[in-house]
Amino acid sequence: MVEDGRNAVRRWAGWAILALAVAVPACSWTRSQEPLWDDVAHYRQILQQTAYEDATCAAPEPTATAGPPIMIDDAAPQQYWDLTLQEAVELALTNSTVLRELGGALIRSPDLLETIHQPAIRETDPNLGPEAALSEFDAIYSSNVLVEKNDRALNNLFTGGGTQLLEQDLAVIPFQIEKAAATGSRFYLRNRIDYDANNGAGNRFPHAWNWLVEAEVRQPLLQGAGVEFNRIYGPSGRLGAPRGVTIARLNTEVGLAEFQIAMRDYISNVENAYWELYFAYRDLDAKLTARDASLEIWQRLRTLQESQRVRGENEARAREQYYRFQAEVQNTLVGRLWEPTRTGNGTTGGTFRGVQGVHVAERNLRLLIGISLADGRLIRPIEEPSTAEVLFQWEEISTEALVRRTELERQRRMVKRRELELLASKNFLQPRLDVISRYRWRGFGEDLMGGGDNGTPYPDAWANLMTGDFQEWALGMEFTFPNGFRQAHAGVQNALLRLARERAVLEQQERQILHDLGNSLADMKRAYAIVQTNYNRRVAAQQDLDALQERERTGQEVDWDQLLESWRRVTDAEIQLHRSLVEYVMAVKNVHFEKGSLLDYNQVQFADDCRSGLASSAAL
């Protein structure tokens, strides 16, 4: 009978090992029998293969390549690309996998740049995302198979069941389902099958099966109890490291707010680059006109000098002015690598610089909107800045800024998170008191199943289990009490300090936003007044130039130095007029930036679920 039992357990062991081998084939591997240090050809082959793979990587996508940039000695482009601001924004949104910015941050700190994938990356974080927090409440299945062969000498006859030379075949097959509940409860359902065949003289059967089915419930009454605590800290959260569903969703919403901030800054930079290029063209036009006029005056004075009708210094002054404007034309056409107008330089939305030049500003705009860096065409803005006066009511826009600014939405969620953490951390000031209840059914038999009526009281374990003859239960409590609660008190104090910090930051952010909004509104008023002043200045300068040119046409004596100076004043007045126009339109943009409506101002809308995510904290 012992041999039959041993054959049975061997069959069970064989099936168990086969099942494990089929279930986890990926966990097996083969080890080379050759000494690794005898021949390095294996490693050389790996290196050659690696080098080959690197050398045959895919070619860059066409969007990542570009022709040579337009140089100063290149001919004028044969084709212009007339572009409106709305078209530039649409192109930027179409090609905005990475929310680019000027200044090289993409190369220096690529991990700090936002991409369109960031919200989904945060949402699917396997450690801190909402799904990771919800997974704490998923049912966990666990099982294993253990087969033993025991052969030992025993000192005590009773310990060996009537023998002092124990020979035993033992198999244990446990299975468990564990589930955590939102109240802090944990439920366990266990199934365990034991097989024991040994040579003990006191055995009823030479081999026997035990079948056990058990249910257990563990319910915390103090620390760890309650739906609110478990939604904040989660079933496995530690003091100071909450991992609950509520915290995970707040973290996701904070990340979503950061993405919206990055998108707003990106659109602001696209608009900044567009108006930079617009001004560069107007600056170039004014200087081209002045250069051509200076060339004409120089040529006329050179002719008069040859006939000795003017002195040589007049011709030299005209020549110097021509070359001065020629140098400015060259600089304005090609541009210089100075800091562009971008978010955060001077003002939050960007203070207009207007120092780049056409080619540099055009390449910057191409970079931002994600198109080819050079395609033989030259982008030309065709949208004119508005000259209409824009009026804002301070009471309305200040309230709107405090409601709509995404930075404040983000910080309010941080305050909400700290409030929840403080509330839940007080739970750790209680001792751990768990109620434990357990109920168990047992089955015993010579065979596992299908023993039939062989004349024994326990033919098989399954049938005996179904009769319910053997039932057990246990009820008790488990108590843990750390003396003094030193760590818990430190955790509560830390949560209080963190909450105080976030509230102070929120208060100062509100003050800063109102300060910046006031600055932007005042700057918009200043820019509009300067537009009117520079317009009048340009009219006066043009009238002065027209009067001098009229004297020249009618053959009256002309002060050539005054004529040259008049052209300089007209050119500077023209440039300053267009500069003030661009400053005004950008000041209007910056007011929208400060009051949180820039994306609406540029007709950019997020999906409904994106906005509803930020609004969901009211339900927490």
Residue spans for each PLM region:
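C-terminal motif of bacterial Sec signal peptides marking the signal peptidase cleavage site
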Residues: 24-26
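Acidic, low-complexity, intrinsically disordered peripheral segments
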Residues: 28-51, 317, 331-376, 380-388, ...
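Regulatory alphaC helix of protein kinase catalytic domains
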Residues: 57-103
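A glycine-/polar-enriched beta->alpha junction
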Residues: 97-102, 113-120, 124-139, 154, ...
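Amphipathic alpha-helical coiled-coil segments
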Residues: 115-116, 120-133, 258, 262-287, ...
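Transmembrane beta-barrel strands of outer-membrane/channel proteins
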Residues: 141-149, 189-195, 433-441
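Extracellular loop and loop/strand-boundary signature of outer-membrane beta-barrel proteins
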Residues: 159-163, 199-203, 303, 312-314, ...
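Hydrophobic, small-residue-rich alpha-helical packing segments that form membrane-like cores
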Residues: 209, 213-226, 232-350, 357, ...
